[in-house]
A protein has these predicted regions:
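N-terminal ligand-binding/catalytic initiation module
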Residues: 2-154
């Protein structure tokens, strides 16, 4: 007999089967532009990227026009307070962060990527977030234990 979740009445086996079916995990990346011809590929990558690169270098706000930044959220955790399960580590938090990412997509059409930081050092977590924050239009902090979560949020 498989163990049932108290919350949704799904067995652990059903949940594991859901996560492993088809492609593993719950998120994937797809192109918002056509990539059917050599020209498309050249515009999407090299040499076509040179034009928006130069424009963004002159005016960083143009990153919102020429890239996905404005519709991209980082869902970040260190896994120190996973959904009532406790501190199970950053990698174990990945299914939760992927789940939050698909909720962003499903209910707000916001693209999101999960980022698990393998550290319990508040300064290290803050530094990592600061260093990657320019890539994203938003940062969602998730399942970071108190009191560190309040320090990181500030």
């Amino acid at each position: 007999m498989t163990k049932k979740s108290k919350i949704d009445h799904y067995s652990d086996k059903e949940a594991l089967d859901f996560h492993i079916a088809g492609k593993s995990g719950k998120i994937e990346i797809s192109s918002s532009k056509p990539l059917t011809t050599k020209r498309d590929l050249s515009l999407a990558y090299s040499p076509g990227v040179a034009a928006p690169v130069k424009e963004i270098a002159k005016n960083p706000d143009l990153a919102y026009d020429y890239t996905s930044k404005g519709n991209l959220v980082a869902v970040i955790s260190n896994g120190s307070a996973i959904l009532g399960l406790g501190n199970l580590g950053s990698l174990a938090s990945k299914p939760v962060m992927e789940g939050k990412s698909v909720l962003f997509k499903r209910f707000a059409d916001i693209d999101s990527i999960d980022i698990e930081i393998n550290s319990n050092n508040t300064d290290s977590i803050i530094e990592t977030i600061k260093n990657i924050s320019g890539t994203f239009g938003g940062i969602n902090l998730e399942d970071i234990a108190a009191p560190d979560c309040f320090i990181v949020e500030q």
